[in-house]
């Protein structure tokens, strides 16, 4: 009977400990759950394009989970899930040389183009949530919603914006020194 009581105390302690970790999400747990790769690239392009490093990391995580080889069914490529047509336009704006789709497989180029695009959207909309909505659903959709005096009309895009905002807080807390805070 004493062994059973001791076992129940141990199990209860483990369950309570696990609940504490899941609920409080200490930085070590967040780092295990939400990795940060390509730190120098993220920090460098965040600085170059006046982006909050945690925001850039959050977008990358949401788009690709830091998988440089990620591909979407819509044809988006790489860490920041850029469409080739969008990236080609960005290459022209940034003075890049001849654009090749394979450039998007390069983490440095992908994050550079994605950072430029995110900065462009932030400047255009003057609002982080609208910029994130445009990153996810496209500028045309956001412009249409705004012209009609409406908010974000796609539930997927509302979820995307909320998720990136949450991830930004996670990355800011878990990787403060790595991201230069």
Question: Model-derived features: where do they sit?
Answer:
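Catalytic glycan-binding domains that act on GlcNAc-containing polysaccharides
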Residues: 19-181
């Amino acid at each position: 009977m004493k062994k059973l009581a001791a076992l129940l105390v141990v199990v209860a302690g483990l369950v309570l400990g696990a609940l504490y970790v899941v609920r409080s999400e200490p930085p070590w747990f967040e780092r295990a759950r939400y990795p940060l790769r390509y730190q120098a690239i993220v920090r460098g392009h965040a600085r170059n394009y006046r982006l909050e490093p945690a925001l850039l990391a959050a977008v990358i995580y949401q788009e690709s989970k830091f998988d440089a080889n990620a591909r979407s069914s819509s044809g988006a490529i790489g860490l920041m899930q850029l469409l080739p047509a969008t990236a080609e336009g960005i290459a022209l704006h940034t003075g890049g040389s001849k654009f090749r789709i394979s450039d998007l497989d390069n983490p440095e180029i992908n994050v550079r183009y994605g950072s430029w695009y995110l900065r462009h959207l932030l400047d255009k909309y003057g609002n982080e949530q609208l910029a994130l909505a445009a990153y996810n659903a496209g500028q045309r959709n956001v412009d249409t919603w705004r012209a009609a005096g409406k908010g974000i009309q796609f539930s997927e895009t509302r979820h995307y914006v909320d998720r990136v905002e949450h991830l930004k807080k996670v990355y800011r807390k878990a990787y403060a020194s790595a991201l230069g805070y």
